[in-house]
Amino acid sequence: MPTYRFGKHPRKSDYRTLRFKNYVTAALPPPPSSLNVLDRVYAKLGTSDPTTLFPLDGNDTLGDCTMAALAHAITTYRGILGSKDIMSKQAVVKLYLHLTGGVDSGLNELDVLNYWRSHAVSNDKILAYVAVDPKNHTHVQQAIQLFGGVYLGFQVPHNCLDEFNARKPWTPGPLTNDGHAVFAYGYDQSFVNVLTWGNTQPGTWGWWDECVDEAYAILPPEASNPGFAPGFNITQLKQDLDGVAH
């Protein structure tokens, strides 16, 4: 049986973190009842094998899930645009150890996202990230629709690995002291679908509500283009971002 690691630190609170809800306008339509962003990625790249596009990235031996989820976000974003960009395991691990100071200590998601906003990873710096309230399912779904996914963290229940290995959806249950970072790419009325450990994995909305403790929409460089996210006030966000930076 393969081994898998976690590695997400407890959620870090920073009052400067911008919030998704503050940029939603009346022009933003309700999200569709179901969405699978990977359908677009697969169509553009001519493959439907998640194990090839979204590899383990060392998360079987290292607690680098926060960095593996970042790499999966990059592959998803670039894939939507028709470009195949898969970070090598060596690049993911090198960046992870750079941020940890060379030790396998895990990371918190805000530090990873702040680094990505200031430094290019796989040739791109993100424009920004915004916190999404995990309890607001509509905003979670709108964030996936607008920005291709949600970078999230959750407290790990005891049944997590058993359900993953059995290819069964994650369900709520007693929690461990571990945290895990994944990238959500889709949903329907019953499940949220994420990328982790070199594969796709569904989780029930009950699991989501019980376990997910942080979620972020990531705005790629293209978000600066006019009309990128209709109904989401990116102009105001950029102004607020300048204020936070100073």
Please place each PLM-identified region on the residue numbering.
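Catalytic-core signature of thiol
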Residues: 1-246
